[in-house]
């Protein structure tokens, strides 16, 4: 019999379901960087990918299992369809992890059975039972999901779950695959499972939901009240279509309203024990990392991690907050790792002070990474006399967490004005080490720079998104540029930061082109292998 956990288990699927968001494609090193940060955040399980989907996915899951899947670290999980080859690939990928999980699934709604699977109900039950048992032959930790459970016939759903648990599933995950249910409906589904699946006490009930109607977090909280003890979520709520339930919103909702949720977990209302293992002070840093690497910007009014989450415009609100924060703030910004943005370093600060402050902010850099970041810090400090924690974060993210360095910006010069045609000259270092220079005229300085870069790189693409944000206030603030471009049906993102937004724009564009170029090279190699 499985012992019910004392805390809510946080299952992070940013690297699997979150990466399915258009344009959020990550390379292996970026996935590893996020996995390491998720471990620092304190998630219980990392769904590292879908091992059978591609060689790249397999390698990413395997590398994360090797590096992050330590005895004291999170469980490393791979998704697998209810098929022998999928499950075998998942088992091989998670093998290096001290604690590994296989998550297998098959659809159970009539619409999926009829049109997608073309299977009968008895056939689906038999497949679920067989594949869970097969997964169990590789690991004791097996999760089973009845896809589209929210639209499945309850009686059939109960039968499938009972047989899956009997075959060895230790976690039963209930997905609202298309984000269709309302909180009361979703809570009723979980309650029905608790009451009608005879062996449900042998498994943990998990939930997975999408945000198509904006109800994912509300559905999950209702599920907790009805017996769910594992929540499958993503950082910033990224994912397919309208995204997934946001980890930061779920965790902070239960943290701030702990007295409300305590009784549903059999605790005294006034218990101060945390409901999850999450280190909330790592939330903001994790949010920024995922946003920077995926190119998925966080909307300013996003709960918990949005730029305006702790901002007050109304004079009445401002007056109240100045007198006592609790008048209009239900949580302290420092709870999620936001600092008061104190000025800590300047151009006279040395390497030791730089290293020490980065450690205090939670950055763990190798000596090579530290050297690169310190050089960039000195460059910024010469232009910007006051360096804040947010500036340091932008410097580290920009210098260390970048796309493969295939093309590199060596020079950017622009000429523009009210009576001049914007002209740009750029010099790029190619993957072969050659320096190429070209120039172009555009509708503005950024357009001219991008046209000049395209003349050098010569990879057809369409720019579909361009965004500039300042890291801090002030005329000398670092500007962060995020761009997304499309090549055929795929979307690639780029991110860069600089006190000169034209330079940042060039670097962000080249970062996105590097991702595109690396992808084309990988395709060519795979074509050669299969030819």
UniProtKB/Swiss-Prot annotation:
Residues 408-531 are annotated as: Regulatory domain. One of its GO terms (molecular function) is 2-isopropylmalate synthase activity. Pathway: Amino-acid biosynthesis; L-leucine biosynthesis; L-leucine from 3-methyl-2-oxobutanoate: step 1/4. It catalyses: 3-methyl-2-oxobutanoate + acetyl-CoA + H2O = (2S)-2-isopropylmalate + CoA + H(+). Pfam families: HCS_D2 (PF22617), HMGL-like (PF00682), LeuA_dimer (PF08502). Mn(2+) binds at residues 17, 208, 210, 244. One of its GO terms (biological process) is L-leucine biosynthetic process. Its cofactor is Mn(2+). It is found in: Cytoplasm. The keyword DNA-binding does not apply. CDD domains: DRE_TIM_IPMS. Its EC number is 2.3.3.13. GO terms for cellular component: cytoplasm. Its main location: cytoplasm. Keywords: Amino-acid biosynthesis, Branched-chain amino acid biosynthesis, Cytoplasm, Leucine biosynthesis, Manganese, Metal-binding, Transferase. Residues 8-284 form the Pyruvate carboxyltransferase domain. Gene3D superfamilies: 1.10.238.260, 3.30.160.270, Aldolase class I. HAMAP family: LeuA_type1. Catalyzes the condensation of the acetyl group of acetyl-CoA with 3-methyl-2-oxobutanoate (2-ketoisovalerate) to form 3-carboxy-3-hydroxy-4-methylpentanoate (2-isopropylmalate). Belongs to the alpha-IPM synthase/homocitrate synthase family. LeuA type 1 subfamily. Homodimer. This is 2-isopropylmalate synthase. The lineage of its organism: Bacteria, Bacillati, Cyanobacteriota, Cyanophyceae, Nostocales.
């Amino acid at each position: 019999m499985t012992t019910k956990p004392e805390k809510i288990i946080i299952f992070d699927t940013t690297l699997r379901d979150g990466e399915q968001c258009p344009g959020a494609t990550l390379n292996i090193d970026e996935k590893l960087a996020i996995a390491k940060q998720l471990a620092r955040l304190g998630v219980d399980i990392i769904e590292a990918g879908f091992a059978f989907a591609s060689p790249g996915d397999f390698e990413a899951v395997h590398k994360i299992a090797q590096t992050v899947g330590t005895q004291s670290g999170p469980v490393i999980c791979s998704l697998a369809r209810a098929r022998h080859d999928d499950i075998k690939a998942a088992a091989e990928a998670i093998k290096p992890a001290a604690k590994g999980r296989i998550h297998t699934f098959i659809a159970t709604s009539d619409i999926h059975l009829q049109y997608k699977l073309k299977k009968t109900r008895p056939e689906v039950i038999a497949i679920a039972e067989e594949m869970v048992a097969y997964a169990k032959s590789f690991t004791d930790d097996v999760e089973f999901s009845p896809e589209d459970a929210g639209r499945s016939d309850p009686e059939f759903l109960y039968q499938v779950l009972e047989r899956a648990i009997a075959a060895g599933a230790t976690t039963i995950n209930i997905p609202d695959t298309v984000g269709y249910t309302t909180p009361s409906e979703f809570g009723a589904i979980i309650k029905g499972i608790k009451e009608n699946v005879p062996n449900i006490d042998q498994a943990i009930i998990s939930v997975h939901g999408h945000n198509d109607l904006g109800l994912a977090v509300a559905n999950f909280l209702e599920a907790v009240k009805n017996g769910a003890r594992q929540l499958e979520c993503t950082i910033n709520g990224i994912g397919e279509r309208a995204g997934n339930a946001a980890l930061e919103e779920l965790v902070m909702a239960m943290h701030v309203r702990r007295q409300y949720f305590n009784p549903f977990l059999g605790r005294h209302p006034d218990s101060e024990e945390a409901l999850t293992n999450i280190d909330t002070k790592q939330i903001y840093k994790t949010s920024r990392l995922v946003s920077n690497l995926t190119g998925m910007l966080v909307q300013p009014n996003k709960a918990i991690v949005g730029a305006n989450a702790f901002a007050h415009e109304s004079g009445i609100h401002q007056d109240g907050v100045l007198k006592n924060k609790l008048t209009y703030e239900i949580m302290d910004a420092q709870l999620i790792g936001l600092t008061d943005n104190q000025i800590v370093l300047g151009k006279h600060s040395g390497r030791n002070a730089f290293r020490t402050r980065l450690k205090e902010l939670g950055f763990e850099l190798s000596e090579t990474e530290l050297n690169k970041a310190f050089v960039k810090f000195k460059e910024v400090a010469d232009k910007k006399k006051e360096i804040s924690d947010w500036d340091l974060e932008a410097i580290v993210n920009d210098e260390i967490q970048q796309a493969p360095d295939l093309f590199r910006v060596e020079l950017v010069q622009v000429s523009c004005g009210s009576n001049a045609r914007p002209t740009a000259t750029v010099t790029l270092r190619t993957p072969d080490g050659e320096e190429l220079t070209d120039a172009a005229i555009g509708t503005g300085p950024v357009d001219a720079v991008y046209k000049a870069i395209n003349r050098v790189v010569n990879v057809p693409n369409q720019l579909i998104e361009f965004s500039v944000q300042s890291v801090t206030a002030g005329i000398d603030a670092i500007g962060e540029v995020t761009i997304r471009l499309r090549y055929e049906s795929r979307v690639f993102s780029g991110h860069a930061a600089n006190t000169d937004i034209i330079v940042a724009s060039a670097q962000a564009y080249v970062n996105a082109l590097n991702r595109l170029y690396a992808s084309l090279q990988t395709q060519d190699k795979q074509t050669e292998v299969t030819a």
